[in-house]
């Protein structure tokens, strides 16, 4: 992975055990982000709107005693399909292995409040932030050990695992136990239908990313095929079926507005079909008196 030296702003590549402690930035993309190629000329890069949040994240990392930072806009060479595929398949782990994640909310002006009324207004803007509506920020919320939220002016709003867990629950529908580093309620241990219900509330720019942004949460690797549309979401479900005997993957709702009339699959046509599926829980085979869950497999015909 490439990391930014927070002092020189230069990029350096690391791998395996050589990767140093680093901070990581989570944000929503705007119209003038700085690419890997553009970062090679820092004078030109600094003229783009996307530069300021990278600079701010570097300053925050320095304040936190860290020398390295990862940002998805300029640390990945997106002109290389192989590098992009590797990065997307690795991204959950990169967030999980970070020392701290800075969630930057460009649509929350400041985290500074002077009274209770200001605090209430801040929390309302926090819950309504676009950051909570994007597909990619779901794993960025759940993978790191620590997530600290910052407003547009880089004032701190609070952390996921402590002061903001209730607000995040209200904004996302994600149970608080998955937010506070509960040793029992790891996000990876949540049932398939629960994870899909989290996704159903989010949007992406390219519909394939509805599948690709969930690879880490399901601990799945699969090739990226931009241009395949919603077939990517079907492929994701097929990989889940192959790797996990979790029956909640079938707990989806037939919604006529999103389900093709000729749909004959056991798999859902869209994450929206899971919008009410958070209430289902995967069964523990160790507690099943019948001796375990029935198994299933994908064939060249069907499930």
Task: Give the predicted meaning of each segment.
Residues 1-13, 18-200, 251:
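Intrinsically disordered, low-complexity acidic segments that are enriched in bulky aromatics
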């Amino acid at each position: 992975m490439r990391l930014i030296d927070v002092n020189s702003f230069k990029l350096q590549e690391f791998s395996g055990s050589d990767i140093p402690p680093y901070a990581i930035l989570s944000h929503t993309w705007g119209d003038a982000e700085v690419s890997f190629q553009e970062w090679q000329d820092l004078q030109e890069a600094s003229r783009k709107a996307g530069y300021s949040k990278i600079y701010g994240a570097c300053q925050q990392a320095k304040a936190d005693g860290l020398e390295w930072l990862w940002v998805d806009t300029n640390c990945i060479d997106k002109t290389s399909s192989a590098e992009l595929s590797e990065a997307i398949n690795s991204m959950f782990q990169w967030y999980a292995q970070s020392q701290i994640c800075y969630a930057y909310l460009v649509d929350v002006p400041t985290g500074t409040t002077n009274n209770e009324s200001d605090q209430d207004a801040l929390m309302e803007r926090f819950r309504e932030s676009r950051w909570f509506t994007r597909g990619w920020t779901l794993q960025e919320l759940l993978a790191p050990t620590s997530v600290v939220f910052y407003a547009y002016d880089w004032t701190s709003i609070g952390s996921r695992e402590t002061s903001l867990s209730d607000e995040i629950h209200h904004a996302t529908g994600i149970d608080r136990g998955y937010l506070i580093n509960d040793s029992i309620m790891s996000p990876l241990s949540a049932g398939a239908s629960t994870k899909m219900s989290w996704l159903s509330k989010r949007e992406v720019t390219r519909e394939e990313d509805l599948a690709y942004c969930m690879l880490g949460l399901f601990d799945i690797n699969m090739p990226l095929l931009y241009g395949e549309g919603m077939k990517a979401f079907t492929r994701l479900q097929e990989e889940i079926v192959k790797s996990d005997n979790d029956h909640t993957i079938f707990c989806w709702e037939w919604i006529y507005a999103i389900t093709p009339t000729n749909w004959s699959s056991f798999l859902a046509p869209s994450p929206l079909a899971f919008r009410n599926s958070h209430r289902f829980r995967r069964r523990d085979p160790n507690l099943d008196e019948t001796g375990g869950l029935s198994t299933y497999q994908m064939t060249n015909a069907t499930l």
